[in-house]
Amino acid sequence: MEQQVKDDIQRVFQLQKKQQKALRASTAEQRREKLQRFLDSVIAHEEEIIEAIRKDVRKPYHEVKKAEIEGTKKAIRDNMNNLEQWMAPKEVGSSLSPDANGILMYEPKGVTLILGPWNYPFMLTMAPLAASLAAGNSAIVKLSDFTMNTSNIAAKVIRDAFDEKEVAIFEGEVEVATELLDQPFDHIFFTGSTNVGKIVMTAAAKHLASVTLELGGKSPTIIDSEYDLMDAAKKIAVGKFVNAGQTCIAPDYLFIKKDVQDRFAGILQTVVNAGFMEDDHTPDRSKFTQIVNDRNFNRVKDLFDDAIERGAEVVFGGVFDASDRTISPTVLKNVTPDMKIMQEEIFASILPMMNYEDIDEVIDYVNDRDKPLALYVFSKNQDLIDNVLQHTTSGNAAINDVVVHFSDVNLPFGGVNTSGIGSYHGVYGFKEFSHEKGVFIQAAE
């Protein structure tokens, strides 16, 4: 990395540090004006953003439009529309005296760093940025070096909307991220893998910076044999195979009773063929996404090959096209825990099925492993649902659906332990980027 880039990073960090007194006093109107500039810039560059993302990873136009563009605009508007309510001090009373009172004040953390991922490179970087700005912070942003076209247009969006003392963006490879992590940020927000999350947390510890880590994990899906299999298949097909399975909360593997396994797989194949395929073997390029790079393609192929060697069977799919970096939607059965595919997050369009007889088997299996980012249950049996929810831990859970909880701003979104630290969306994002200050007020004599 050039010395000039290092110097620029340090210069911009110090520039933003000097703005903190003014930012702490910023009003809802001032913050809303920044967010409006942000929104206007996203709208102005909308088609360029879509084109850049599709250059980095071939995604269907409608997927990019919905997830990356509409998702970003929704996040910005949600922050704009709720600023006064979120910023207002909250009275909590006092446990010491009827003449005293306690209030909670929300103040900006300061200079924040936002490190984005490659799977949804625009929205998963810009939505946290909106929360940081709503909380009154300044920010430095870096997107993944796997999506350089998206990074280039994101830089244009940010520079058209903000002075660098408000928001700055740096582009480049891992050396740039390393230099950024050397700065004493007040808060770091990272979305990506657990392994890199550990690196980020180690860097933050040097300065005792608070962190939000949006990571991943193996999110289990459980189907009760009494549930409507067509409904489950439609929802799982979208949650698993949109973006070729490269979604942190995609169903990673499936627990299903053996007596309905083949029937479910047949229904799922029909749904998948209608939604993603040209024929039984070839994904429709206009509807299906590539794997991001050769390294990840080869990693997933290794997981698949190991599973087959150990006795797993392909129910449908299993077609790997290295020249196009596509893996056809694939379902495996006769999967066992010792297979590599059950030991790391798949992050691709392969769904392993495992059988169970009693729900306690599933609960024990989940609890013996790292806590997942999400857990899904398809059932009409409230006792079964309650049993799973009460006896497992996951970042989030959804009942009779998958993935959609991400879009519900009334819920916090985040992981637990290896699947993440902290949460955001809606008011939870505002609080994540704020210092909640308790103030004790004693009545004057």
UniProtKB/Swiss-Prot annotation:
Domain of life: Bacteria
Reaction catalyzed: an aldehyde + NAD(+) + H2O = a carboxylate + NADH + 2 H(+)
Catalytic center residues: 214, 248
A GO CC annotation given for this chain: cytoplasm
Disruption-associated phenotype: No effect on vanillin degradation.
Gene Ontology molecular function: any one: aldehyde dehydrogenase (NAD+) activity
InterPro entries: Ald_DH/histidinol_DH, Ald_DH_C, Ald_DH_CS_CYS, Ald_DH_CS_GLU, Ald_DH_N, Aldehyde_DH_dom, Aldehyde_DH_NAD(P)
Gene Ontology biological process terms from the UniProt entry: aldehyde metabolic process
Alphabetized UniProt keyword annotations: NAD, Oxidoreductase
EC number(s) from the headed UniProt entry: 1.2.1.3
Family to which this protein belongs: Belongs to the aldehyde dehydrogenase family.
Name by which UniProt lists this protein: Putative aldehyde dehydrogenase AldX
Organism: Bacillus subtilis (strain 168)
Species classification: Bacteria, Bacillati, Bacillota, Bacilli, Bacillales
Gene name, Swiss-Prot/TrEMBL: aldX
